[in-house]
A protein has these predicted regions:
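Short pre-catalytic strand/loop immediately N-terminal to key active-site residues, enriched for Gly-Thr
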Residues: 11-12, 191-205
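Conserved N-terminal subdomain of the carbohydrate kinase-like
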Residues: 2-105, 109-117, 256-260, 264
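Glycine-rich beta-alpha junction loops
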Residues: 10, 37-39, 81, 109-111, ...
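Charged C-terminal helix
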Residues: 225-269
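Short, small-residue alpha-helix embedded
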Residues: 146, 200-224, 228
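Conserved phosphate/ATP/ADP-binding segment of small-molecule kinases
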Residues: 117-191, 225
Length: 269
């Protein structure tokens, strides 16, 4: 199996590609990358970071890949910094995704009830168009509300049901409720929920950890019903370890020591 991860590369602060590449690779799946931007650190709490938009470089990269005959079993998109980069993912799906391959979209746009700086209603509309082409979409609660055009207080079950208008397999992540954090997803025409205990605090990269492990699980042959509990438990274990061991949470999850147990569970050991 071969996965292409399309996301930004933050040199410091574990998120995006610095989570996707090790997590997917550790699961025995080839992971190639297409960086959408290069940052000195991620933007969650750091000041003075550098940002290099790589949009203009992407066509040259893809032109060379075409000469190599590259194709992918999964294309997994995360942070896309412009509407043009959404078009790039659509092009990748058309030109580089194998027959029967899957497009997994993590529609990174916002959190805590608002869009991230620089994201506009026009971008949201374009992201909806991408989600309509995707096999799996993994928004957090805020992103799910913007995609479905429902109020921010909408519950996870309603959001997952509403998002079926966009994609056959919506997976709403990070829904906090009654001391638990829940994932809502569609399975056999029913909205299902998987919950784990909430750990107080904000943990950068948690969404990337869940999405990357989910892609790895699918690539390893797991069904959505099998993958979501495994990936939710893996993400929770990473968060709990980080709460104990990481003083400055901006630097991301301590996921490395949880990878081996996760891989063993994927293999059924």
């Amino acid at each position: 199996m071969r996965v292409l991860a399309v996301n930004d590369l933050s040199c410091v602060g574990k998120c995006s590609l610095t989570v996707a590449l090790p997590v997917i690779s550790a699961c025995g799946v080839t992971c190639d990358v297409l960086p959408t931007a290069l940052l000195s650190t991620h933007t969650g709490g750091f000041e003075g970071y550098t940002f290099l938009d790589l949009t203009s470089e992407l066509p040259s990269i893809l032109k060379q890949w075409k000469t190599l005959g590259l194709t992918f079993d999964f294309i997994y998109s995360g942070y896309l910094g412009s509407e043009s980069q959404i078009d790039t993912v659509l092009f990748l799906q058309k030109e580089f995704l194998k027959a029967g391959g899957k497009l997994v979209v993590d529609p990174v746009m916002g959190d805590a009830g608002k869009l991230y700086d620089g994201f506009t209603p026009s971008f949201v509309q374009k992201m909806r168009a991408l989600c309509k082409k995707a096999d799996y979409v993994l928004p957090n609660r805020t992103e799910a509300c913007f995609l479905s055009e429902l109020p921010l207080e909408t519950d996870g079950k309603t959001l997952a049901a509403a998002l079926q208008k966009l994609t056959p397999c919506p997976i709403v992540t990070g829904v906090e409720e009654e001391g638990e954090i829940s994932v809502y997803y569609q399975s056999e025409n029913t909205v299902r929920r998987y919950a784990t205990p909430t750990t107080q605090g904000f943990f950068c990269g948690a969404g990337d950890g869940f999405a990357s492990s989910f892609v790895a699980a699918l690539a390893g042959g797991k069904t959505i019903e099998e993958a979501i509990p495994l990936c939710a438990e893996f993400t929770t274990a990473c968060i709990e370890r980080s709460a104990r061991e990481v003083e400055d949470k901006r630097y991301g999850l301590n996921f490395e020591k949880e990878l081996f147990p996760f891989v063993k569970k994927l293999k059924g050991e």
